């Protein structure tokens, strides 16, 4: 029998992109009827600025508009994540560098850009929408749905 999969999404502060990725991915898993394939779907940040906080209101707004809800509270990446997760997906190149900088030697986690699962013509980098307007959050949502669907196809 195939081992269940643990997936972690990582951005900078864990209030915009990664909690959206977690919620979108969970939704896509449910829509595909693949819940039994996953033990853990979570998100965190490389920084600790927002630990314990709910996602940015604009993240919650985009999720709600698309019928997705989350109860996520921000947390920081920890060394235990590298042994507890099969995939650690970074939202951008800076996140990826920061994750790899603290990755313990011998880690079992596959660390990569979530955007490696982008469809042709879709940017692999999920830009941080924090300092922009609501449009950036909508753009993130579109990318994250695309990446999620393609990742799920890749493991089917």
UniProtKB/Swiss-Prot annotation:
GO MF term set: acid phosphatase activity; non-membrane spanning protein tyrosine phosphatase activity; protein tyrosine phosphatase activity
Family per record: Belongs to the low molecular weight phosphotyrosine protein phosphatase family.
Catalytic-site annotation from UniProt: 11, 17, 128
SUPFAM superfamilies listed in its UniProt record: Phosphotyrosine protein phosphatases I (SSF52788)
Reactions mediated catalytically: O-phospho-L-tyrosyl-[protein] + H2O = L-tyrosyl-[protein] + phosphate; a phosphate monoester + H2O = an alcohol + phosphate
UniProt-annotated location(s): Cytoplasm
Source organism, top-level taxon: Eukaryota
Free-text function comment from the UniProt entry: May contribute to dephosphorylation of 'Tyr-15' of cdc2.
Enzyme class: hydrolase
EC annotation from Swiss-Prot or TrEMBL: 3.1.3.48, 3.1.3.2
Pfam families: LMWPc (PF01451)
Signal peptide range: none
Record-level GO cellular component terms: cytosol; nucleus
Keyword tags: Cytoplasm, Hydrolase, Protein phosphatase
UniProt record, GO biological process: signaling
Protein name per the record: Low molecular weight phosphotyrosine protein phosphatase
Major localisation: cytoplasm
Organism in which the protein naturally occurs: Schizosaccharomyces pombe (strain 972 / ATCC 24843)
Protein's gene: stp1
